[in-house]
């Protein structure tokens, strides 16, 4: 990971910069291949950050005052998760779920995503959780390569109910801790 990057829980004073992060990522995706299917003003937006902050589940990677990335870590599966055959069988009390892993375009290929995943895994172990689960829109090859490189195993492909946004299929991943 790039030297000087610190990963920590977000605080209210970070919200404007997180909103800016989301906006700049979506702007970048509009002019490049939009692997995750994110759209400015639709997802991710400030309200997503506010809700995660209120639940104490929003974490950020910072370089000085610049937010290079963020991730939401909670125990809330998407509705389609029940249709999968996971590696572990437990309640979501002992399973961490990764949502909205975001890296600013200026920090792509700098190890921010890998660092956020390592941070998530450490946080999950401390709870203690037995595994981490996540979903990624089918065809988001950069994200899938990252997850596979970090030891996540693809479980299956399901609908999460986002067909209206042109996102019919998601690949599910799990890493046993």
Task: Describe the predicted segments one by one.
Residues 1-16:
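Conserved N-terminal entry element of GNAT/NAT acetyltransferase domains
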Residues 6, 19, 26-48:
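Conserved GNAT-fold acetyl-CoA-binding loop/helix
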Residues 90-91, 130, 137-144, 148-150, ...:
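C-terminal "cap" of GNAT-fold acetyltransferases
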Residues 103, 109-122, 145, 149:
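Conserved acetyl-CoA-binding loop-helix of GNAT-fold acetyltransferases
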């Amino acid at each position: 990971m790039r030297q000087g990057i610190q990963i920590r829980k977000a605080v209210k004073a970070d919200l404007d910069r997180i909103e800016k992060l989301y906006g700049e990522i979506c702007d970048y995706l509009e002019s490049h291949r939009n692997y995750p299917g994110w759209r400015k003003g639709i997802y991710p937006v400030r309200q997503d950050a506010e809700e995660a902050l209120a639940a104490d589940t929003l974490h950020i990677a910072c370089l000085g005052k610049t937010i290079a990335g963020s991730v939401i870590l909670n125990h809330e599966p998407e509705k389609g998760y029940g249709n999968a055959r996971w590696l572990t069988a437990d309640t979501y009390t002992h399973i961490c779920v990764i949502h909205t892993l975001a890296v600013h375009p200026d920090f792509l290929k700098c190890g921010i995503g890998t660092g956020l995943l390592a941070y998530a895994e450490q946080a999950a172990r401390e709870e203690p959780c037995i595994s981490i689960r996540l979903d990624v829109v089918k065809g988001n090859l950069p994200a899938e390569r990252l997850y596979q490189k970090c030891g996540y195993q693809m479980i299956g492909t399901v609908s999460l109910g986002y067909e209206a946004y042109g996102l019919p299929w998601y690949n599910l991943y799990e890493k046993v801790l």
